[in-house]
């Protein structure tokens, strides 16, 4: 979820309280506390760290009390002895923990995936109920904050909207998934891993992704749906990344392992020549491949046109690899494909690892484990 929505949700939560510290800092501090978990980006310097840290430990349920404590210490005006109607420190701590939980809620209902079980698991929770930027969620919150004076009932309604609207999206997602499965089953198609994603203006537009086995291999299909779950455009087809290949690459590289855990139904295509390594590896039969997933697109033509206008518009999250048959490299008989070089590039944030040698996964140190690094 975008930071404006996070901050607005915190402001609404504070304004909905019947009693709050009588300081002009009360609402801004609540807004900042609700947006604060995204400060994990401050500690990111490489694409791999972006995948491991963003929506990572600062979004973890286990770390929530600690982050809440740090935020409570920063919210000194709320528990300062000279503040009229001040709260005790424990109450401020409870508030900041609630703001962190509110942030986590608004992230898990999107499609990105949030690692709420760190440091015990890197599993990403995604409920696929709300598009990553949803004006139907954000604008009512901003309007309520603007009209807040002596309107606590309005604030309570806005706070309820923070939960009711995303929860409704999650329910609609489940309904659309059941509709799509029934339709494809009636067409006698061999599909698996069907996933419904919210599109822009998601109560009215959705996207369905699924894998389909065909004689020429496994494909990933994508189709835009209307509010009634009916297809509104022809399917688009992409070559699925073979699971055996992704597993082999994951065993050979912590970068590949992390990327494929992040993706949803990854697809594969030959790499564009301009993105290939400048210096050849010299290995016979080497080939360059691009992996990505389809979560961050849209089935709406006007939305795609808007997305194409953003600076450095491209596939948002890309894994490029140079691979060769294992027999082309002596002593590499344990895998069908040998990973020679790799590159992570995230176009929107302009993060690029450039071509580098893979690093084999290893058990993390205690410090790395605690913060979710590998």
Which residues does each predicted region cover?
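Extracytosolic and intramembrane catalytic regions of membrane-associated proteins
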Residues: 192-193, 204-374
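N-terminal membrane-targeting hydrophobic helices
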Residues: 1-198
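A short catalytic or substrate-binding loop motif that flags glycine-/basic-rich loops and adjacent residues
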Residues: 199-203
């Amino acid at each position: 979820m975008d930071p404006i929505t996070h901050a607005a949700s915190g402001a609404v939560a504070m304004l909905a309280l019947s009693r709050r510290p009588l300081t002009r800092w009360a609402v801004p501090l609540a807004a900042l506390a609700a947006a604060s978990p995204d400060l994990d980006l401050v500690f990111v310097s490489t694409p791999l760290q972006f995948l491991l840290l963003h929506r990572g430990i600062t979004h973890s349920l286990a770390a929530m009390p600690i982050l809440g404590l740090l935020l409570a210490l920063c919210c000194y005006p709320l528990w300062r002895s000279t503040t009229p109607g001040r709260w005790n420190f424990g109450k401020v701590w409870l508030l900041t923990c609630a703001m962190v939980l509110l942030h986590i809620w608004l992230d898990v209902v999107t499609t990105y995936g949030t690692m709420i079980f760190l440091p015990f698991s890197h599993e990403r929770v995604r409920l696929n109920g709300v598009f990553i930027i949803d004006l139907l969620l954000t604008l009512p919150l901003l309007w309520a904050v603007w009209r807040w004076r002596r309107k606590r009932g309005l604030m309570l309604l806005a706070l309820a909207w923070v939960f009711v609207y995303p929860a409704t999206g999650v329910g609609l997602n489940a309904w659309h998934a059941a509709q799509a499965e029934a339709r494809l089953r009636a067409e006698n198609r061999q599909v698996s891993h069907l996933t419904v994603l919210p599109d822009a203006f998601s109560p009215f537009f959705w996207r369905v992704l699924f894998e389909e086995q065909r004689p020429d291999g496994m494909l990933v299909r994508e189709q835009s749906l209307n509010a009634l779950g009916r297809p509104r455009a022809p399917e688009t087809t992409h070559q699925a990344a073979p699971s055996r290949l992704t597993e082999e690459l994951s065993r050979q590289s912590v970068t590949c392992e992390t990327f494929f855990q992040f993706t949803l139904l990854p697809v594969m295509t030959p790499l564009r020549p301009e993105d290939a390594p400048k210096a050849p590896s010299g290995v016979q039969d080497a080939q360059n491949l691009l992996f990505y997933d389809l979560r961050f697109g849209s089935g709406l033509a006007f939305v795609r046109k808007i997305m194409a206008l953003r600076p450095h518009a491209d596939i948002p999250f890309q894994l490029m690899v140079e691979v060769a048959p294992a027999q082309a490299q002596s002593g590499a008989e344990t895998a069908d494909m040998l990973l020679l070089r790799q590159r992570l590039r995230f176009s929107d944030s302009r993060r690029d690892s450039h071509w580098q040698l893979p690093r084999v996964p290893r058990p993390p140190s205690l410090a790395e484990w605690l913060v979710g690094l590998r």
